[in-house]
Amino acid sequence: MTNKFGITIFICIASFLFSFSQTKKSVSTKKTTENISIDAELNEASWKDAEIATDFVSLEPKNGTPIPEEFKTEVKILYSNDAIYIGAKLYDPNPEKILKELVERDEIGTSDYFGIFINGYNDGQQEFRFFVTAANGQIDTNFTSAEGEDGSWNAIWESNAKITDFGYVVEMKIPYAALRFPEKDKQTWGLNFLEKLEENAKNILGVQLIIKLEPFRNKPEF
């Protein structure tokens, strides 16, 4: 493991994500004009109305197998004029066993975590990867098919994480300034979501999604 969350682990995870499912799922999202507070509460009206992405499957150790209901993951996505928002509920029947070591930025330590890989061109060539641990530690990297993982890349983004009675919640706000995507009104992005459960036999869970952002008029000014 390196301080940048483990380049070797990231590369292995990427190969699993690109191979475990040939059929990509899709989920709709919508634009919000609310002031979304990044507090891991997900209590704004926009979150309550957003579509839930589920159907996570195991990537390790049993690739492609369904996730038990007690460990289900639910993800919602919103976007505004300047950022994309991700809200995730990560269920665990034993929340007291969720690992949440406090470490420096870009270090994982011994923690459960949730992450999103964003491909703004939906072409499989480049991904910006953002991870949040159960202790609200942030890790970000840039991956390209030509160069592999760039652990030195850092972006400015917001996150929060909170342990609950059903598991834990992660909320993220990623400004468009941290991403790359085409300049057009209607956007179609490819996303991979990833969850690591240390206590649950070190399972790695994932789901591939396509999202459409429309209307997406006038490229935001940063």
Give the role of each language-model region.
Residues 1-25:
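Bacterial Sec-dependent N-terminal signal peptides
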Residues 20-222:
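Structural preference for beta-rich elements and adjacent junctions enriched in aromatics
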